[in-house]
């Protein structure tokens, strides 16, 4: 493939209604063109390629059979939504995916009327779809609701909560289980296609409906006999399943890359749906692009790449990543302490725990997309004397917050929480930003909340957490490379609740929590040059605060600025609360708090996002000058 792909069929499709004019026999060629278009686009932007390649035929079939956007279509997580975006009026912008001011990498209601529900986190589609199905019933509408969910997302309890509720309500909901687990072989041959058509057709569904109506007039004994007969007949077609027990009519598995399988089943379900239906579709992640099919991760998330070779463009790192530093430090501690356990929720590669699993497989647990379970599982380990490190992305820790409060914090169980992807994450936008962890953790009694200023500090915090047994403790760190500081052979145990002064001055104090420390030091150079002698301190802890350090900074400086990569209500708010309670604001310094802005910040390069938020060198300098009432060009969000 060289240059722009040739796509004569795809050129005829601007919106799903155009698919109605394309003959079924031409759909395989349309699928090939759609794959070529998506591969070319993602090669220029980077993104989640493998999932979208796996659902090309399924996406075409859904939009051809159903009447979107009147019929509702929800994609779980959203990694697989790129073909959907191309088919729904956004092809001309597909090469802006995940770029500043470009298309989101996920479905977004504000972006298109075809995006019925926003996504980013997993396992939400069935719940949202059920709500829409009930709304359709209340409206007296015949619109259909289709939720597409991957087999990985089915590991979350929320998906089963929704299935259970949908079955109990007998709702008119279509769930398509996109099974791309390569351990499950796709069905092949005419017989499986025939059985799927039979199972979804009028004959069997009518028989089942007749059986339900008949049992309403008969006694329990005959009722049970008829129910067994209907179930037995169903078993001849595809066999009983857990989904049947939950009240769903189950069809499949069927080949998700065969229009001969997909179209008749979807048409039957569209025309005959009585209650909740689950269609089990087997697909191959990365389908149609050899480098993706051959890769272990099926090109789940990729950088820009060469379409011919599949080689990804990766800049040579200047310093080790925070994730790799965490993983190596944890392995070092685990080698010395057999009580240390690693726990993650479907992100072993992303959190670095895959490295620990190679050395300590019996002490490393990937519990699937199940953050609630991960937190309480870790609490159980801690209750019996182990030292669990429950490593989660900041944005996903939100999903386990009740468990963190109820099962960990109230019981003062020493669960360690390494929090990756703290702060802005760039191209994945607001659904994946690590904005809120400091705010929701520091409010909990007995919680220790740390943030690493650089990769050496991260190593200290891993060892500190390993040694701390008094209760729960967390430490946050961002995505990407470290600063490039000299690394200790092993981390030191930090004194809980004590920060450090990096540079001493007399007029301005910059109190940093997290990796904005480097920007604070750069800002201090500019302030010193302007005659404003500046102190720079690293708080290390948002809870417990270093009260002596805050008193010292307040007593000896005219301006005190707190800087953090978190939302309003976090570190700066706790500093202000203490200062107000201690009377340090009565006649003390001018205090300013720099946080992430109180708005959903859209995708861009992280450095751009921080600059726009006023959390870079220029923004810090501007804040100081404004506090002093001196004129200085400002940088930051308006309003």
Curated annotation (Swiss-Prot):
Pfam families in UniProt: DXP_synthase_N, Transket_pyr, Transketolase_C
SMART domains hit by this protein: Transket_pyr
Pathway the protein takes part in: Metabolic intermediate biosynthesis; 1-deoxy-D-xylulose 5-phosphate biosynthesis; 1-deoxy-D-xylulose 5-phosphate from D-glyceraldehyde 3-phosphate and pyruvate: step 1/1
Cross-referenced InterPro entries: Dxylulose-5-P_synthase, THDP-binding, Transketo_C/PFOR_II, Transketolase-like_Pyr-bd, Transketolase_BS, Transketolase_C, Transketolase_CS
SUPFAM superfamilies (alphabetical): Thiamin diphosphate-binding fold (THDP-binding), TK C-terminal domain-like
GO biological process: 1-deoxy-D-xylulose 5-phosphate biosynthetic process; glyceraldehyde-3-phosphate metabolic process; terpenoid biosynthetic process; thiamine biosynthetic process
Residues noted as binding thiamine diphosphate in the record, renumbered to the chain: 79, 120-122, 152-153, 180, 289, 371
Cofactor binding annotation: Binds 1 Mg(2+) ion per subunit.
Residues noted as binding Mg(2+) in the record, renumbered to the chain: 151, 180
CDD domains: TPP_DXS, TPP_PYR_DXS_TK_like
EC number(s) reported in the record: 2.2.1.7
GO molecular function annotations of the record: 1-deoxy-D-xylulose-5-phosphate synthase activity; magnesium ion binding; thiamine pyrophosphate binding
Metal-binding among keywords: yes
Enzyme class, first EC level, given as a word: transferase
Catalysed reactions, semicolon-separated: D-glyceraldehyde 3-phosphate + pyruvate + H(+) = 1-deoxy-D-xylulose 5-phosphate + CO2
Similarity comment: family membership: Belongs to the transketolase family. DXPS subfamily.
Protein's UniProt name: 1-deoxy-D-xylulose-5-phosphate synthase
Gene: dxs
């Amino acid at each position: 493939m060289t240059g722009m792909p040739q796509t004569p069929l795809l050129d005829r499709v601007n919106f799903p209604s155009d698919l109605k004019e394309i003959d079924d026999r031409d759909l395989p060629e349309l699928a090939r063109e759609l794959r070529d278009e998506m591969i070319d686009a993602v090669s220029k932007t980077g993104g989640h390629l493998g999932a979208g390649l796996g659902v090309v035929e399924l996406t075409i079939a859904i939009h051809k059979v159903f009447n979107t956007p009147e019929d509702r279509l929800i994609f779980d997580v959203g990694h697989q939504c790129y073909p959907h975006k191309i088919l729904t009026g956004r092809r001309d912008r597909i090469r802006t995916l995940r770029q500043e001011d470009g298309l989101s990498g996920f479905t977004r209601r504000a972006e298109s009327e075809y995006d019925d529900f926003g996504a980013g986190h997993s396992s939400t589609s069935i719940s949202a779809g059920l709500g829409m199905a009930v709304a359709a019933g209340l409206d007296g509408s015949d619109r259909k609701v289709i939720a597409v969910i991957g087999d990985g997302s089915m590991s979350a309890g929320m998906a089963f909560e929704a299935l259970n509720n949908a079955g109990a309500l007998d709702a008119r909901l279509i769930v398509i289980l996109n099974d791309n687990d390569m351990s499950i072989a796709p069905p092949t041959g005419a017989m499986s296609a025939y059985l799927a058509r039979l199972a979804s057709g009028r004959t069997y569904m009518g028989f089942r409906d007749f059986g339900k109506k008949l049992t309403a007039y008969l006694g329990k004994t005959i009722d049970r006999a008829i129910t067994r007969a209907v179930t037995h007949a169903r078993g001849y077609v595809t066999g009983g399943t857990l989904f049947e027990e939950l009240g769903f009519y189950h069809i499949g598995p069927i080949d998700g890359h065969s229009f001969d399988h997909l179209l008749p089943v979807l048409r039957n379900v569209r025309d005959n749906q009585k209650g909740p239906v689950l269609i089990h579709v087997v697909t191959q992640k990365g389908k149609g692009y050899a480098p993706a099919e051959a890769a272990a991760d099926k090109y789940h998330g990729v950088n820009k790449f060469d379409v011919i070779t599949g080689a990804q463009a990766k800049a040579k790192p200047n310093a080790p990543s925070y994730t790799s530093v965490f993983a190596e430090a944890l392995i070092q501690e685990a080698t010395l302490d057999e009580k240390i356990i690693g726990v993650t929720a479907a992100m072993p590669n992303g959190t670095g725990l895959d490295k620990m699993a190679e050395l300590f497989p019996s002490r490393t647990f990937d519990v699937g997309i199940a953050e609630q379970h991960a937190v309480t599982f870790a609490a159980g380990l801690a209750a019996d004397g182990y030292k669990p490190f429950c490593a989660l992305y900041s944005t996903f820790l939100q999903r386990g917050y009740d468990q963190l409060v109820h099962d960990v914090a109230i019981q003062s169980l020493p669960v360690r929480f390494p929090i990756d992807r703290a702060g802005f994450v760039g191209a994945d936008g607001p659904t994946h930003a690590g904005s809120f962890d400091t705010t929701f953790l520091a409010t909990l009694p007995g919680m220790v909340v740390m943030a690493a200023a650089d990769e050496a500090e991260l190593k200290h915090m891993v060892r500190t957490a390993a040694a701390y047994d008094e209760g729960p403790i967390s430490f946050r760190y961002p995505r990407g490379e470290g600063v490039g500081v000299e690394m200790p052979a092993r981390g030191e145990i930090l004194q809980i609740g004590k920060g450090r002064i990096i540079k001493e001055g007399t007029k301005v104090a910059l109190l940093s929590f997290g990796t904005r420390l480097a920007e604070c030091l750069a800002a201090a150079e500019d302030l010193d040059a302007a005659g404003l002698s500046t102190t720079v301190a690293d708080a290390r802890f948002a809870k417990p605060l270093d009260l002596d350090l805050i008193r010292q900074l307040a007593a000896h400086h005219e301006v005190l600025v707190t800087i953090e990569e978190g939302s309003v209500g976090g570190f700066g708010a706790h500093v202000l609360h203490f200062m107000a309670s201690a009377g340090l604001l009565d006649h003390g310094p001018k205090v300013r708090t720099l946080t992430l802005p109180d708005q959903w910040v859209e995708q861009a390069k992280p450095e751009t996002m921080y600059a726009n938020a006023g959390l870079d060198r220029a923004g810090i300098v501007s804040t100081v000058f404004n506090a002093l009432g001196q004129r200085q060009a400002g940088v930051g969000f308006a309003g």
